[in-house]
Protein backbone atom coordinates (compact mmCIF):
# COMPACT_ATOMS: atom_id res chain seq x y z
CA UNK A 1 0.00 0.00 0.00
CA UNK A 2 1.00 3.62 -0.45
CA UNK A 3 2.75 5.68 2.18
CA UNK A 4 3.18 9.43 2.28
CA UNK A 5 2.40 12.62 4.18
CA UNK A 6 -0.83 14.44 5.02
CA UNK A 7 -0.39 18.11 5.95
CA UNK A 8 -2.90 20.55 7.35
CA UNK A 9 -2.97 23.86 9.19
CA UNK A 10 -0.54 23.29 12.07
CA UNK A 11 -0.04 19.53 11.76
CA UNK A 12 1.81 16.87 9.76
CA UNK A 13 0.79 13.20 9.58
CA UNK A 14 3.05 10.39 8.29
CA UNK A 15 0.92 7.73 6.59
CA UNK A 16 2.45 4.26 7.03
CA UNK A 17 -0.22 2.06 5.45
CA UNK A 18 -3.57 2.21 3.66
CA UNK A 19 -6.09 -0.63 3.75
CA UNK A 20 -9.67 -1.15 2.58
CA UNK A 21 -11.37 -3.45 5.12
CA UNK A 22 -14.70 -3.08 3.32
CA UNK A 23 -15.45 -1.85 -0.17
CA UNK A 24 -15.50 1.93 -0.37
CA UNK A 25 -13.80 2.52 2.99
CA UNK A 26 -10.10 3.42 2.94
CA UNK A 27 -8.37 3.34 6.32
CA UNK A 28 -5.03 5.09 6.87
CA UNK A 29 -2.62 3.91 9.56
CA UNK A 30 -0.60 6.97 10.46
CA UNK A 31 1.49 8.74 13.07
CA UNK A 32 1.14 12.42 13.90
CA UNK A 33 4.61 13.87 13.40
CA UNK A 34 3.77 17.30 14.80
CA UNK A 35 0.84 19.46 15.82
CA UNK A 36 -2.73 18.48 16.71
CA UNK A 37 -5.22 17.08 14.19
CA UNK A 38 -8.75 18.52 14.12
CA UNK A 39 -11.75 16.83 12.53
CA UNK A 40 -12.95 18.61 9.40
CA UNK A 41 -9.62 20.34 8.73
CA UNK A 42 -8.56 20.90 5.11
CA UNK A 43 -5.54 18.77 4.24
CA UNK A 44 -3.19 17.97 1.37
CA UNK A 45 -2.20 14.32 0.86
CA UNK A 46 1.12 13.62 -0.84
CA UNK A 47 2.00 10.06 -1.86
CA UNK A 48 5.62 8.89 -1.70
CA UNK A 49 5.90 8.64 -5.48
CA UNK A 50 9.31 6.93 -5.64
CA UNK A 51 8.23 4.24 -3.19
CA UNK A 52 5.07 3.67 -5.23
CA UNK A 53 7.09 3.35 -8.43
CA UNK A 54 9.46 0.86 -6.82
CA UNK A 55 6.50 -1.08 -5.46
CA UNK A 56 4.90 -1.16 -8.90
CA UNK A 57 8.04 -2.78 -10.32
CA UNK A 58 7.88 -5.52 -7.70
CA UNK A 59 4.14 -6.02 -8.19
CA UNK A 60 4.41 -6.33 -11.96
CA UNK A 61 7.45 -8.56 -11.44
CA UNK A 62 5.26 -10.87 -9.35
CA UNK A 63 2.83 -11.24 -12.27
CA UNK A 64 5.73 -11.94 -14.62
CA UNK A 65 7.18 -14.61 -12.28
CA UNK A 66 3.74 -16.25 -12.15
CA UNK A 67 3.56 -16.32 -15.94
CA UNK A 68 7.14 -17.61 -16.23
CA UNK A 69 6.42 -20.46 -13.79
CA UNK A 70 3.38 -21.42 -15.86
CA UNK A 71 5.45 -21.38 -19.04
CA UNK A 72 8.26 -23.51 -17.58
CA UNK A 73 6.36 -25.85 -15.23
CA UNK A 74 2.82 -25.83 -16.60
CA UNK A 75 -0.54 -24.53 -15.46
CA UNK A 76 -0.40 -26.72 -12.34
CA UNK A 77 1.99 -24.17 -10.76
CA UNK A 78 -0.91 -22.10 -9.46
CA UNK A 79 -0.52 -19.16 -7.10
CA UNK A 80 -0.90 -19.81 -3.37
CA UNK A 81 0.12 -16.38 -2.12
CA UNK A 82 2.48 -13.49 -2.71
CA UNK A 83 4.10 -10.47 -1.12
CA UNK A 84 5.94 -7.56 -2.67
CA UNK A 85 7.54 -4.32 -1.59
CA UNK A 86 10.06 -1.91 -3.06
CA UNK A 87 12.70 -3.97 -4.88
CA UNK A 88 11.58 -7.35 -3.51
CA UNK A 89 8.96 -10.01 -4.15
CA UNK A 90 8.09 -13.50 -3.03
CA UNK A 91 5.67 -15.85 -4.72
CA UNK A 92 4.16 -19.07 -3.36
CA UNK A 93 2.84 -21.69 -5.78
CA UNK A 94 1.55 -25.25 -5.86
CA UNK A 95 4.33 -27.72 -6.71
CA UNK A 96 5.41 -30.99 -5.13
CA UNK A 97 9.19 -30.86 -5.48
CA UNK A 98 12.11 -28.48 -5.50
CA UNK A 99 13.03 -26.88 -8.81
CA UNK A 100 16.20 -28.02 -10.54
CA UNK A 101 18.93 -25.49 -11.25
CA UNK A 102 18.07 -25.61 -14.95
CA UNK A 103 14.38 -24.94 -14.21
CA UNK A 104 15.24 -21.96 -12.01
CA UNK A 105 17.51 -20.55 -14.70
CA UNK A 106 14.77 -20.98 -17.29
CA UNK A 107 12.16 -19.25 -15.10
CA UNK A 108 14.55 -16.34 -14.55
CA UNK A 109 15.34 -16.15 -18.27
CA UNK A 110 11.68 -16.19 -19.32
CA UNK A 111 10.96 -13.41 -16.81
CA UNK A 112 13.83 -11.23 -18.00
CA UNK A 113 12.96 -11.76 -21.66
CA UNK A 114 9.45 -10.53 -20.88
CA UNK A 115 10.98 -7.48 -19.19
CA UNK A 116 13.34 -6.87 -22.11
CA UNK A 117 10.51 -7.11 -24.66
CA UNK A 118 8.89 -4.05 -23.07
CA UNK A 119 5.37 -5.47 -23.01
CA UNK A 120 2.62 -2.93 -22.55
CA UNK A 121 0.75 -3.26 -19.24
CA UNK A 122 -2.99 -2.76 -19.69
CA UNK A 123 -5.70 -2.66 -17.02
CA UNK A 124 -9.36 -3.23 -17.85
CA UNK A 125 -12.57 -3.68 -15.92
CA UNK A 126 -14.99 -6.34 -17.13
CA UNK A 127 -17.57 -8.85 -15.88
CA UNK A 128 -16.07 -11.76 -13.96
CA UNK A 129 -17.46 -14.26 -16.46
CA UNK A 130 -15.74 -12.46 -19.35
CA UNK A 131 -12.43 -12.36 -17.45
CA UNK A 132 -12.63 -16.11 -16.83
CA UNK A 133 -13.43 -16.70 -20.50
CA UNK A 134 -10.26 -14.80 -21.40
CA UNK A 135 -8.27 -17.11 -19.12
CA UNK A 136 -7.43 -14.49 -16.50
CA UNK A 137 -5.75 -16.11 -13.51
CA UNK A 138 -7.18 -15.53 -10.05
CA UNK A 139 -5.91 -16.11 -6.53
CA UNK A 140 -6.94 -19.47 -5.09
CA UNK A 141 -9.74 -19.05 -2.52
CA UNK A 142 -10.26 -15.33 -3.22
CA UNK A 143 -13.82 -14.02 -3.58
CA UNK A 144 -14.52 -11.59 -6.44
CA UNK A 145 -17.43 -9.32 -7.31
CA UNK A 146 -19.42 -9.35 -10.54
CA UNK A 147 -17.08 -6.77 -12.09
CA UNK A 148 -13.32 -7.31 -11.82
CA UNK A 149 -10.12 -5.53 -12.81
CA UNK A 150 -7.86 -7.43 -15.20
CA UNK A 151 -4.15 -6.63 -15.59
CA UNK A 152 -2.50 -7.78 -18.82
CA UNK A 153 1.24 -7.81 -19.48
CA UNK A 154 1.99 -8.55 -23.10
CA UNK A 155 -1.55 -9.72 -23.83
CA UNK A 156 -1.72 -13.46 -23.32
CA UNK A 157 1.71 -13.67 -21.67
CA UNK A 158 0.17 -12.60 -18.35
CA UNK A 159 -3.48 -11.94 -17.61
CA UNK A 160 -4.59 -11.77 -13.96
CA UNK A 161 -7.35 -10.41 -11.78
CA UNK A 162 -5.70 -7.66 -9.73
CA UNK A 163 -6.57 -4.36 -8.08
CA UNK A 164 -3.04 -3.10 -7.47
CA UNK A 165 -0.79 -0.55 -9.15
CA UNK A 166 1.62 -1.57 -11.91
CA UNK A 167 4.27 -0.21 -14.26
CA UNK A 168 3.21 1.15 -17.65
CA UNK A 169 5.44 -1.28 -19.54
CA UNK A 170 7.49 -4.29 -18.48
CA UNK A 171 10.87 -2.70 -19.32
CA UNK A 172 10.36 -0.27 -16.43
CA UNK A 173 11.10 -3.20 -14.08
CA UNK A 174 14.72 -3.18 -15.30
CA UNK A 175 15.76 -6.70 -14.34
CA UNK A 176 14.72 -9.59 -12.11
CA UNK A 177 17.05 -11.82 -10.11
CA UNK A 178 15.89 -15.03 -8.43
CA UNK A 179 17.33 -15.32 -4.93
CA UNK A 180 15.93 -18.51 -3.43
CA UNK A 181 13.50 -21.36 -4.04
CA UNK A 182 12.26 -23.30 -1.02
CA UNK A 183 9.46 -25.36 0.52
CA UNK A 184 6.68 -23.65 2.49
CA UNK A 185 4.70 -26.75 3.40
CA UNK A 186 3.54 -29.91 1.72
CA UNK A 187 2.86 -29.33 -1.96
CA UNK A 188 3.84 -25.67 -1.93
CA UNK A 189 7.03 -23.89 -3.00
CA UNK A 190 8.26 -20.30 -2.68
CA UNK A 191 10.51 -18.21 -4.89
CA UNK A 192 12.03 -14.90 -3.80
CA UNK A 193 13.42 -12.32 -6.19
CA UNK A 194 14.79 -8.80 -6.48
CA UNK A 195 13.79 -6.29 -9.16
CA UNK A 196 15.01 -2.96 -10.45
CA UNK A 197 17.99 -1.31 -8.77
CA UNK A 198 17.97 -3.91 -5.99
CA UNK A 199 18.45 -6.62 -8.62
CA UNK A 200 21.33 -4.69 -10.20
CA UNK A 201 23.01 -4.07 -6.83
CA UNK A 202 22.75 -7.75 -5.95
CA UNK A 203 24.34 -8.81 -9.24
CA UNK A 204 27.07 -6.17 -8.83
CA UNK A 205 27.87 -7.48 -5.33
CA UNK A 206 28.05 -11.06 -6.62
CA UNK A 207 30.34 -9.97 -9.46
CA UNK A 208 32.65 -8.28 -6.94
CA UNK A 209 32.69 -11.44 -4.83
CA UNK A 210 33.48 -13.64 -7.84
CA UNK A 211 36.31 -11.30 -8.86
CA UNK A 212 37.74 -11.50 -5.34
CA UNK A 213 37.56 -15.30 -5.37
CA UNK A 214 39.18 -15.40 -8.82
CA UNK A 215 42.11 -13.42 -7.45
CA UNK A 216 42.39 -15.43 -4.22
CA UNK A 217 42.31 -18.76 -6.07
CA UNK A 218 44.77 -17.48 -8.69
CA UNK A 219 42.76 -18.56 -11.75
CA UNK A 220 42.46 -16.78 -15.08
CA UNK A 221 38.66 -16.85 -15.31
CA UNK A 222 35.68 -17.29 -13.01
CA UNK A 223 34.78 -20.33 -15.12
CA UNK A 224 37.84 -22.06 -13.62
CA UNK A 225 36.69 -21.46 -10.03
CA UNK A 226 34.64 -24.66 -9.47
CA UNK A 227 37.49 -26.95 -10.53
CA UNK A 228 40.08 -24.96 -8.55
CA UNK A 229 37.91 -24.91 -5.42
CA UNK A 230 37.25 -28.66 -5.67
CA UNK A 231 40.99 -29.29 -6.01
CA UNK A 232 41.72 -27.09 -2.99
CA UNK A 233 39.06 -28.82 -0.88
CA UNK A 234 40.43 -32.24 -1.86
CA UNK A 235 43.94 -31.17 -0.83
CA UNK A 236 42.63 -29.78 2.46
CA UNK A 237 40.77 -33.00 3.21
CA UNK A 238 43.88 -35.07 2.45
CA UNK A 239 46.03 -32.80 4.64
CA UNK A 240 43.55 -33.05 7.53
CA UNK A 241 43.53 -36.84 7.20
CA UNK A 242 47.33 -36.94 7.18
CA UNK A 243 47.54 -34.64 10.20
CA UNK A 244 45.08 -36.79 12.14
CA UNK A 245 47.15 -39.88 11.33
CA UNK A 246 50.34 -38.19 12.53
CA UNK A 247 48.64 -37.22 15.78
CA UNK A 248 47.47 -40.80 16.34
CA UNK A 249 50.94 -42.18 15.65
CA UNK A 250 52.46 -39.66 18.05
CA UNK A 251 50.09 -40.60 20.85
CA UNK A 252 50.51 -44.31 20.20
CA UNK A 253 54.27 -43.84 20.41
CA UNK A 254 53.75 -42.15 23.77
CA UNK A 255 51.26 -44.75 25.01
CA UNK A 256 53.93 -46.40 27.16
CA UNK A 257 54.67 -43.11 28.91
CA UNK A 258 50.97 -42.59 29.46
CA UNK A 259 50.74 -45.90 31.30
CA UNK A 260 53.61 -44.83 33.56
CA UNK A 261 51.40 -41.97 34.73
CA UNK A 262 48.56 -44.30 35.70
CA UNK A 263 47.54 -44.02 39.35
CA UNK A 264 46.45 -46.90 41.57
CA UNK A 265 43.27 -46.24 43.47
CA UNK A 266 42.55 -49.17 45.75
CA UNK A 267 43.13 -52.16 43.50
CA UNK A 268 42.36 -50.29 40.30
CA UNK A 269 44.78 -48.51 38.01
CA UNK A 270 43.35 -45.28 36.61
CA UNK A 271 44.75 -43.39 33.64
CA UNK A 272 43.40 -39.93 32.77
CA UNK A 273 44.56 -38.14 29.63
CA UNK A 274 43.17 -35.21 27.64
CA UNK A 275 43.03 -36.42 24.03
CA UNK A 276 41.16 -33.37 22.78
CA UNK A 277 43.37 -33.11 19.71
CA UNK A 278 42.03 -36.44 18.42
CA UNK A 279 38.79 -37.15 16.61
CA UNK A 280 36.47 -39.97 17.69
CA UNK A 281 38.34 -42.58 15.65
CA UNK A 282 41.67 -41.45 17.08
CA UNK A 283 40.40 -41.70 20.67
CA UNK A 284 39.08 -45.20 20.00
CA UNK A 285 42.38 -46.37 18.49
CA UNK A 286 44.37 -44.90 21.39
CA UNK A 287 42.07 -46.58 23.92
CA UNK A 288 42.42 -49.93 22.18
CA UNK A 289 46.20 -49.57 22.10
CA UNK A 290 46.33 -48.74 25.82
CA UNK A 291 44.03 -51.61 26.70
CA UNK A 292 46.26 -54.04 24.84
CA UNK A 293 49.18 -52.90 27.01
CA UNK A 294 47.36 -53.79 30.25
CA UNK A 295 48.13 -57.47 29.70
CA UNK A 296 45.76 -59.80 31.53
CA UNK A 297 44.14 -56.99 33.51
CA UNK A 298 40.59 -55.98 32.74
CA UNK A 299 40.29 -52.51 31.27
CA UNK A 300 37.31 -50.16 31.06
CA UNK A 301 37.33 -47.05 28.87
Model-derived features with residue positions:
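A glycine- and charged-residue-rich anion-binding loop/surface
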Residues: 1-301
